[in-house]
Amino acid sequence: HCQNLAEAGGADDRTWQAYLSTQARPGQPAIDARDRIGTGPWYNFDGIMIARDVAHLHGDTIELARLGNNLTKRTGLTEKGQIVPGLNDYKHPQDDVWEYVRTTPYTNRHEILTGSQLDGTAFPSELDYTCDNWTSNADPEPGPNQGGMGMGLYPGRPNAQIGFPDRNGGGDGSWNSSHGTRGCSQTALAMTHGVGKLYCFAID
């Protein structure tokens, strides 16, 4: 998918990978998003450096964590050089309803699927943080706690961990690991302001 997006954006002279972790399954080891994206440095559509290497991207040391990477609302651009609409950009009472969101491009859609922990590694396998390793579009069965969002309220149910390029939203506001979704269908993703977007990194 990232390669197709790069082609549409005129950057298909590079090899692109999605920043996605997968969880361990019987006979299948976990794959960490941080190990899928090359070594850096990475630049956005406008040529601005986002991070110089994997350690800088994730803040692996105290010094790097204090420095932080350069992924922000204004630098986390799409393959067409556009800012990803986020909270307070385009308010509408239906901006968490998929049927509205899918036909209205200027809606809050700042959630990025990652399935990852803050350090870019996969979650333990006991609970689902990856929509069954990106193969499921199932949603939780109706039940208690349907008014909230994320794994704190839906332990073990179909779910994906997300981040925010604008670092503004529920959970801790992290770029790569803020909170979970309400399920794995397009309808469920929209309920917490997502449309299934990915972070794409050039690996060469």
Question: Where in this protein do the model-derived segments appear?
Answer:
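Secreted/extracellular ectodomain signature
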Residues: H1-D204
